[in-house]
Amino acid sequence: MKTLLLTLVVVTIVCLDLGYTLTCLNCPEMFCGKFQTCRDGEKICFKKLQQRRPFSLRYIRGCAATCPGTKPRDMVECCSTDRCNR
């Protein structure tokens, strides 16, 4: 009986989806050191560079469910591994 119980526990642990959470940089600066753990469904890290006016750039980094869209003069890079949006 103990063997059966132990076997069931081992099978449950092996089959259990422990859930992987992605970690992405999340800050508006060019050089960033703040990280966030992405929520369920967010499997993409992104880095967006917006050109507001000549010589004025804005950086946006974070997690997303899909790669964000762009406007003219924007640049977006998307990736799917931890801290890949440097």
Swiss-Prot record:
Main location, first listed in the record: secreted
Signal peptide region: 1-21
InterPro entries: Snake_3FTx, Snake_toxin-like_sf, Snake_toxin_con_site, Toxin_cobra-type
One GO cellular component term: extracellular region
GO MF annotations, alphabetized: acetylcholine receptor inhibitor activity; ion channel regulator activity; toxin activity
Tissue: Expressed by the venom gland.
Record-annotated disulphide pairs: C24-C45, C27-C32, C38-C63, C67-C78, C79-C84
Subcellular locations according to the entry: Secreted
Keywords: Acetylcholine receptor inhibiting toxin, Disulfide bond, Ion channel impairing toxin, Neurotoxin, Postsynaptic neurotoxin, Secreted, Signal, Toxin
SUPFAM superfamilies assigned to the protein according to its UniProt record, in alphabetical order: Snake toxin-like
Domain of life (superkingdom): Eukaryota
Purpose: Binds with low affinity to muscular (alpha-1-beta-1-delta-epsilon/CHRNA1-CHRNB1-CHRND-CHRNE) and very low affinity to neuronal (alpha-7/CHRNA7) nicotinic acetylcholine receptor (nAChR).
Family of the protein in this entry: Belongs to the three-finger toxin family. Ancestral subfamily. Orphan group II sub-subfamily.
Protein name: Weak neurotoxin 6
Source organism of the structure: Naja sputatrix
